[in-house]
Amino acid sequence: YNILFFDNSYVLLPNRMTNMAQNDEIILININGADRPGVTAALTEILAKNNAVILDIGQADIHNHLSLGILFQSTEGNSGDILKELLFKSYELDVNIRFNPITEQEYSKWVGMQGKNRYIITILSRKLTAKQIAGVSRIVAEQDMNIDDIKRLTGRIPLDENARTPKASVEFSVRGTPKNKECMKAEFMKLSTELEMDISFQEDSMYRRMRRLICFDMDSTLIETEVIDELAIRAGVGDQVKAITEAAMRGEIDFCESFRQRCALLKGLDVSVMQEIAENLPITEGVDRLMRILKKVGFKIAILSGGFTYFGNFLKQKYNIDYVYANELEIENGKLTGNHVGDIVDGKRKAELLRLIAQVENVDIRQTVAVGDGANDLPMISIAGLGIAFHAKPKVKATAKQSISTIGLDGILYFLGYKDSYLDEQM
């Protein structure tokens, strides 16, 4: 390279630049320096004046520092004049500029790569660290994929960690086909455990940007408790019911059988206890924000729960939820009989209901999202376009394609590709 210095600015000119042809040249320019209004306009006006064709362009601003790349074609055999003008304008703007000629063969090869598979990798954590970025980047490279773009989804991070509940999310856009997807998933899971983060790997398709229906489990997902355990404590059978619940969540007991066993233990409990529990449900971190934004952007929302309709309807009123399907407890003379009414909403039924609601709402199954924490949520998680295990048991987390374990339920927004910069300002 020939290096030309102008006070604080410089330009790198490849040696072959002096031997370039003067017709239909393809040139890549990279500009970096302090960002301020008018830099991009001033440089692109030079290209416009010379009737250049823009073949690719990208710009990023990190901490008020500009990084701009433009790939253009000179069609009038005057690339020397264009580069000269750009050079002096960059000096005037106090930015650094670098030129690289691109051969037709190099350009054609680049164009041919556009058919490669594209994926989105999303990182969630309480704090973003260099180890996290390095770890994800290493795994991507080992799978022979290339990172095209990296952007921060969460807002600017304050130095005062006590200012708010911290969360950080970064999105990678990558291109290529993984050599071994199962191995990659295992590596991501291992890394997420070691570095306290969540890693989502999704195909970058139009459906990812057009989700329209989201279905939630209720207990230990929308709320930070298992309602049946709360009822059992009031009935004096807390330990017995909790043991059955935990075994069912781990997939060790058939859900329907565990449900019948637990309901039977609640026989004789006064229904007034249900209202008391409903009014004091511990809402999961991030639910208020998530529900507000989902309704704002037009999502249909459903609760598909192995819990009870009484509590699902309470949340339905609180958050304007569209559908609630759960289990109905039988009541006689103001007390629970220990039986239930109707079919049990188990894992199979949840998947059926997701399909049914999608059909009613005219939503493609690939436009759906399912979120849950237990083994009986896996059927709906597995068929949804985006299935998420939330603070789930190890077996569920290992089976689900995506999981969230480090931050609140509003982490789903980042898996959907939303950015804080335009969410919170408009909500």
Model segments located where?
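Conserved active-site and cofactor/substrate-binding residues in soluble primary-metabolism enzymes
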Residues: 34, 38, 77, 81, ...
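Short glycine/serine/threonine-rich phosphate/pyrophosphate-binding segments
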Residues: 39, 132, 222-225, 377-380
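Active-site neighborhood of HAD-like aspartate-dependent phosphohydrolases
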Residues: 47, 206-256
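Long, charged amphipathic helices and adjacent flexible linkers at domain junctions
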Residues: 106-115, 201-212, 245-269, 426
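C-terminal cap/substrate-recognition subdomain and adjoining C-terminal extension
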Residues: 268-427
